[in-house]
Amino acid sequence: MSTKIDGKQIAAEIKTNLAERVNRLKAQGIQPGLGTLLVGEDPGSMKYVAGKHADCQEVGITSVKKELPADASFDDIAATVRELNEDPACTGFIVQLPLPKGINENAIIDMIDPAKDADGMHPYNLGELVLHVRGDISTPLPCTPRGVLELLDAYDIDLNGKEVCVLGRGITIGRTIGLMLTRNAVNATVTLCHTGTRDVADHMRRADVIVAAMGSAGFVTPDKIKDGAVLVDVGISRVYDEEAGRYRIKGDVDKACYDKASAYTPNPGGVGPMTRAMLLANVVEMAERHA
């Protein structure tokens, strides 16, 4: 029987631990704070940011909210990033993406103080990840890849020497999780598949673990996986449900795969809660470094 990897449960346990650590920091006169910069009124982004601040309240982290209109200029956004860099109440912060069309997102991310980069996506922090194949990393790690590894570890899924097929080469998940999986502490062998990969299904069938991060609903089907594979579903697609008359979130993994797998993350309810928990963990760890 396959094991359902419950991201909600593990994230809740992590948040309980974080709340205890926040209380210890407060006893030392240190108050962790998460800042968010939201530009525009995209419903998805607004919901996501609201969820992050609800998480903050749950563990005792201060919320620092910055909002700009959709027509904000590059200079307006840059000035707000500088404010967050200098705000002592903000231990770490994120710029909610995507930014409005025409704004250079990479240039904005470059302006974030690496020590306050709660998403772990600043070029300096990514460079630290590339350089440190062995030993501990003291800089923030990308939230979703970190969440995936924490989730698998919580279920005692050993990746040492395992063949891992990563579907998707985006910087948020695909490329960064490849770096983390190949660190000496994890020691997996990674195949990174993308739009230029030939015979993707052949790579998938050889894999002990598949990390699907394509955003292609139901791409991973039973005929493309081997018996006993571990399936990590990170992809998100909005698919219209004609019966319900509304859109639903669907992952990259077809649910028909679950019986063939040894373990799987549901979507939603698998990796998503862990991403949010890792954002909080990054903020708490930033505060602990200054304790």
Swiss-Prot record:
Pathway: One-carbon metabolism; tetrahydrofolate interconversion. Belongs to the tetrahydrofolate dehydrogenase/cyclohydrolase family. One of its GO terms (molecular function) is methylenetetrahydrofolate dehydrogenase (NADP+) activity. Catalyzes the oxidation of 5,10-methylenetetrahydrofolate to 5,10-methenyltetrahydrofolate and then the hydrolysis of 5,10-methenyltetrahydrofolate to 10-formyltetrahydrofolate. This is Bifunctional protein FolD. GO terms for biological process: L-histidine biosynthetic process; methionine biosynthetic process; purine nucleotide biosynthetic process; tetrahydrofolate interconversion. Keywords: Amino-acid biosynthesis, Histidine biosynthesis, Hydrolase, Methionine biosynthesis, Multifunctional enzyme, NADP, One-carbon metabolism, Oxidoreductase, Purine biosynthesis. It catalyses: (6R)-5,10-methylene-5,6,7,8-tetrahydrofolate + NADP(+) = (6R)-5,10-methenyltetrahydrofolate + NADPH; (6R)-5,10-methenyltetrahydrofolate + H2O = (6R)-10-formyltetrahydrofolate + H(+). InterPro entries: Aminoacid_DH-like_N_sf (IPR046346), NAD(P)-bd_dom_sf (IPR036291), THF_DH/CycHdrlase (IPR000672), THF_DH/CycHdrlase_cat_dom (IPR020630), THF_DH/CycHdrlase_NAD-bd_dom (IPR020631). Its EC number is 1.5.1.5, 3.5.4.9. SUPFAM superfamilies: Aminoacid dehydrogenase-like, N-terminal domain, NAD(P)-binding Rossmann-fold domains. GO terms for cellular component: cytosol. HAMAP family: THF_DHG_CYH. Homodimer. NCBIfam families: PRK14193.1. It comes from the Bacteria. NADP(+) binds at residues 168-170, 195, 236. Transmembrane segments: none annotated.
